[in-house]
């Protein structure tokens, strides 16, 4: 089981490398290795969400209740305080939702319409999920070191804003899990195939697992940002 999202990034990179090597030599053995690796990746994703990410989301809710009980929201601050910008957090979440929606649709299509997909359709699927992934990646790179702002007064309804963001994170974990299951279905659909488009399908599947990795990374970043900000308030 993964202990940090960095481990997701490492394994995702390993899968990408294996696929690149497999495409180069068209080795069935290599593709079998990739399929096994992605299946294990899916299992670890589901376990991480259940054992790590869900608990972090619960921790945010708990800390919001504690902060509200201390009634710090109406206090004048003696010193400036650094808090995560809730609008930036929500913008990141919107991008995560978009890329996961695309990933689920693509995985479902690969799994259910295996014999019907043309080369052009596969190319379109790959381009769409790649574009959405790159948009999320760009936004995350933009905000990950610039998510905080300094406040001299506690913003009105800040706890409600973080609570809303945290609930969206909770919904995101469900979307990630669903995406992982659909990816598993797509893997099963190509496992025993000899179709000559398997290389393109494998590229789509690989980009989908990379999307899941990025979604978890961003969701955890948002949850951690909420938690850190709330604990700064009491």
Name these PLM-found stretches.
Residues 62-234:
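Long, low-complexity or tandemly repetitive, helically biased scaffold regions used
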Residues 13, 21-22, 27, 50, ...:
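Generic low-complexity, intrinsically disordered sequence content enriched
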Residues 24, 28-35, 39, 43-46, ...:
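Membrane-interacting alpha-helical segments
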Residues 2-26, 32:
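Proteolytic processing junctions in secreted/extracellular precursors
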